[in-house]
Amino acid sequence: MRYVGRTLGIGLNNGKPFAFYLLCSRSFPNRRAVVKGNGVYILNQTETENPYVSYPVVRLMEDYAVVTNGLHTDFIAQALEWERPRKALVHVLDALDYERDDYSTPRIAGIIQHGGRRGWLGFVGRDMLWMRELELEEGKAFLTATYNMEGFESIELAFSTPEELAEKVMELPFEHKVLAIGIVENEKGWELSFTPSL
């Protein structure tokens, strides 16, 4: 199995957009997800001076859901107030660049739109910056990761409940999995799910 670090994806299930986040970690496996307001946060449970291991991971908005592996979650959400997803991704990722840690960890991001069938993925690493606007496909997800994944990949991913989405993400064939978060469109907005459950 591959070690991909942080992974996120966007897709379409029963005609509705969804997104997910999979935290895989060798260095800081003792982390948990916490819901606060319209956001989800990854919190590290051990002492460290590393500023990158606790961060906002999901931000739910009226029209969009944003998922990333760092503090750029909130910057992208703010940018979406006045510009389109593709520009929000490019502007924020270009401005913040990759993480200045021992691994030069890339920043990754995904956006889905309520009622939409298109999604956006973005990536910035030491020597690469890209953004893709994608036509979402029924029963599939497009995903990207911080390590050992060239660009983005497509996988089959269908589910019947938000909880099953998080469970299936946790079953993806990647090493050192810690937790998974699912984001699914519903009539009122967005629904979250977690594995392990909160």
Curated annotation (Swiss-Prot):
Gene3D superfamilies referenced in this protein's UniProt entry, alphabetically: Inosine monophosphate cyclohydrolase-like
GO molecular function terms noted in the UniProt entry: IMP cyclohydrolase activity
Domain of life: Archaea
Catalysed conversion reaction: IMP + H2O = 5-formamido-1-(5-phospho-D-ribosyl)imidazole-4-carboxamide
Pathway: Purine metabolism; IMP biosynthesis via de novo pathway; IMP from 5-formamido-1-(5-phospho-D-ribosyl)imidazole-4-carboxamide: step 1/1
InterPro entries, alphabetized: IMP_cyclohydrolase (IPR010191), IMP_cyclohydrolase-like (IPR020600), IMP_cyclohydrolase-like_sf (IPR036795)
Keyword Disulfide bond carried by entry: no
One annotated GO biological process: 'de novo' IMP biosynthetic process
Protein name: IMP cyclohydrolase
Organism of this sequence: Thermococcus kodakarensis (strain ATCC BAA-918 / JCM 12380 / KOD1) (Pyrococcus kodakaraensis (strain KOD1))
